[in-house]
Amino acid sequence: MSTVAIIGAAGGIGRVLVDELSANGSNVIALDLPTSLRAHPLKCTSIPIDILDTESIDLATNIVRSMNLELDGLVNLAGYTKGVRPLVEMDLATFDDTIMGNLRGVFTSTRELLPLMAQNGSIVTVASGLAQSIRPGHGAYAMAKAGIIAMTKTLAIEESPRLRVNAVAPGPVQTAFLTGGTGVSNEDQACIIDVEKLASATPLGRIAIPTDVTGPIRFLLSDQSGFMTGQVLWINGGAYMP
């Protein structure tokens, strides 16, 4: 039985991934904000974590360490957005929050759990199509997600051959992320994108749903991707073709 830790497990993609991995026999450890875990209880071991708080990360890591197991997989889904605005109109507090929540916190939580990984383990991070296909108003988020790609490739080199490290980079996904984010809002804010307009401009005619993302993540966790590291899988229905 493989053991997989998922940071951001209570979000829209995370909940589907928990169910899929559990159904396939994996031992899943879910980590997320306490508010998220209360709002969306999961049928697996759940540990509260706030990736913006180093003490919280240390506490969560120590709890996992106390379980006396090795992680075969680590998926870091954490992240959120704070609306759409041009960079020149963005205040520093919003910029800092965006970088902290989408890059620094992801780096810190991944770094602390990394020593618990098993030999030949797999780490999957979550970037975004915006890291390469820039859209006005999403600059800070795009900068953070471009950093995730750089982090992923760096870890892939530095941790080889012991670990594989890859990323998925979705376009917009039909989850609460588009309406404020799980755990950091009531999940009922106005959608940050025009879904119909974006869907009509996408070759496959819609935006993603969670299973469009969880399938590639499970592939990257599995032995089927055993000769892949430092790679980015773009999941966007053809909206961006590198």
What are these regions (language model features)?
Residues V84, R218, T229-P242:
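Short C-terminal tail/terminal secondary-structure segment
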Residues T110, A144, T152:
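Active-site helix of classical SDR
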Residues R85-L87, D91-I99, L198:
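Substrate-binding pocket helix/loop in short-chain dehydrogenase/reductase
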Residues S128:
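Residue(s) in the substrate-gating loop at a strand-loop-helix junction
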Residues A169-G180, V184:
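Short, flexible catalytic-loop segment of classical short-chain dehydrogenase/reductase
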Residues S2-N27:
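Canonical Rossmann dinucleotide-binding motif of NAD(H)/NADP(H)-dependent dehydrogenases/reductases
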Residues P115, I157-P161, G226:
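Alpha-helical segment proximal to the catalytic Tyr-Lys
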